[in-house]
Amino acid sequence: YKEKISYIFMLEYTSLDGTIIQVGQNAKENDELTVSSSPQYWWMHVAGCSGAHVVVCHEGEQLPKETKKDAMVLAVHHSQAPATKMSCVDLTRVEHVMWMRQAGKVKLTGEVMELTIFMRREKERLERLLNTK
C-alpha cells in the first residue's frame, strides 16, 4: 500500500483499546485517507448521506466490539445524518473500497456489513472520543 500521507487537518482519535481511528474532513481528505490506508484496515461511512470516510487502523479478522462502536459514532458525528435518530453505517475492508474519479465518491465491492447505531445512547462515548484527538 502507499506510504501513509499525514495531513494536518485529518482527524485522528483513539479508541479505548488504543486503536487509532482516522477521519477525513472533506472529499480530498476522504480520498487520500482511503487510498493511503492499508488494504486490511477497516473502512466506515454512514449509508445514504454525505459524510466522512472513517478508517480504523486495525488489521485483525474482526474489529473489537467497542472499537467498532467508537468508529461508528465518529462516522455518524462527521456526517449529515441526524444525530438523534438511528443511523446505518457501512463497514468493509479498505481493499473493498474502489475510488471513483469524482472526489469523495467510492464504490464498495466485496463483503459490506451494514451496522446500526442509535446516537442518543452514545453521548458519553462521543464525548470521550472527542477528547482524544
Show where each model-derived region lies.
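Duplex nucleic acid-engaging cores and interfaces of nucleic-acid transaction enzymes
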Residues: 5-133
